[in-house]
Structure formats: C-alpha cells, structure tokens
C-alpha cells in the first residue's frame, strides 16, 4: 500500500458494486467508461487500490463482473440496501487486520486518492468512528469507517435499518467540508458520464 497518511494506518477498501442501477438501466459496475475499455469497477478499484489493502468488492448474487484481482463477496440477500453490504465489508476488513476501511460506491469515476488521503488524515487526527465528506450533503458511500463497527451494523440491520446514514447517525462521526465536489459525483444516467476519465490523482 502506497501513500501518505494511509501508510500510517491499516486501511482496507470496500467497493459497493451490487446496486440495482435502476436509473441507468444497466449494471454500472460493468459499464465501460468513455475513451477506453476500462469498466467502472476496474477504474474505481485502480484508485482505491493505491491507498487501501486489501480491497473487497461487494456484489449481488449472480452479478457478472470482469476478472478482478481482489476478493469479491456476494450479497447474501437482495434488495436490502447498502448497509448490510457495508457491514459485511467492514467485517472482512477487520478479519484481514485493518482498523479502518474506505467504503465507496462503484459509480464514482471522479474519485481521487487525494480525497482518500484527506479522510484518512482526519481519521488519524480525530480518532472518529466515521469520517465522511460534506459538500452541502453528507456522502456516506465515500467515507472512512472503523472496521469494529460491523457488529453495530448487524444490530441496525436487525432493527430494520437499510441506509448507511443510520450507521453514521449512531456513531462518533466527523464531517469534512469539501470545496471540490467532483470526486464525489455519482453516475446515475448516461448523461452523467464524464469525458474520457483520467486515473484519480
């Protein structure tokens, strides 16, 4: 694992790729980005992998993915939202020995290692359980989570919660104001796709 503050902590990565992609009309993870032959999941893994080790991909049962050089964990149940997948990813990261995990959605082609570094820096300085970016709204799926929150996720899911906001609301959460929203942008329709994407920097 290379990179500044992320070298000082045990940081895993969790990429949530199993969303239903209703607005896009097709699976976002395997969407080929403009200007090349790289899929969205491969592009995001290329960025996350620069700062995180190991990296886990959370995918739906039966969801086709390109060959990946990281563990793929399949959802046990469909349609339960991102919280259960986040919890499973945090547990896998904890079992791998990581204290923190960067959890992100797969549909973030503008993601940068600088964003991850900023969040990690705050995690080190504050020792918060959750560190997430804020640009007028909270971005729960581009955030640092302590891996020991996996059991709290289990309790929230058992209580009927499905959104990652429930985890942040029940945790010691630090929000970092971001002046640049581009790394946080999600791709929901074909019109949201950027011009040929450069690797995050």
From Swiss-Prot:
GO cellular component terms given for this protein: cytoplasm
- Keywords from the UniProt entry: Cytoplasm, GTP-binding, Magnesium, Metal-binding, Molybdenum cofactor biosynthesis, Nucleotide-binding, Transferase
Q: Where in the cell is it found?
A: Cytoplasm
* Enzyme Commission no: 2.7.7.77
List this protein's GO terms for biological process: Mo-molybdopterin cofactor biosynthetic process
Top-rank taxon, per record: Bacteria
One matching Pfam family is NTP_transf_3
Q: Give cofactor(s), names only.
A: Mg(2+)
Q: What are the binding positions for Mg(2+) in this chain?
A: 107
Is this entry keyworded Nucleotide-binding?
yes
Any coiled-coil ranges, and where?
Answer: none
Cite the PANTHER family for this sequence. MOLYBDENUM COFACTOR GUANYLYLTRANSFERASE
About its domains, the entry says: The N-terminal domain determines nucleotide recognition and specific binding, while the C-terminal domain determines the specific binding to the target protein.
Name-wise, this protein is: Probable molybdenum cofactor guanylyltransferase
Source organism per UniProt: Mycobacterium ulcerans (strain Agy99)
């Amino acid at each position: 694992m290379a990179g500044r503050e992320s070298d000082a902590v045990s940081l895993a990565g969790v990429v949530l790729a199993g969303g239903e992609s209703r607005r896009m009309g097709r699976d976002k993870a395997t969407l080929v980005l403009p200007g090349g032959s790289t899929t969205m999941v491969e592009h995001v893994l290329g960025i996350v992998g620069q700062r995180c080790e190991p990296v886990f991909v959370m995918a739906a049962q039966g969801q086709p993915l390109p060959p990946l050089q990281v563990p793929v964990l399949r959802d046990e149940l469909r349609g339960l939202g991102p919280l259960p997948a986040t919890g499973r990813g945090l547990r896998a990261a904890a079992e791998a020995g990581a204290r923190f995990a960067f959890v992100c959605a797969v549909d973030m082609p503008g993601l940068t290692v600088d964003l991850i570094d900023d969040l990690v820096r705050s995690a080190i300085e504050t020792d918060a359980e959750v560190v997430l970016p804020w640009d007028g709204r909270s971005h729960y799926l581009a955030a640092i989570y302590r891996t020991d929150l996996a059991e709290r996720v289990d309790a929230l899911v058992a209580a009927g919660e499905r959104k990652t906001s429930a985890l942040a609301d029940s945790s010691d959460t630090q929000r970092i104001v971001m002046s640049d929203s581009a790394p946080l942008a999600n791709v929901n329709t074909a019109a949201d796709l950027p011009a040929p994407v450069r690797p995050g920097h």
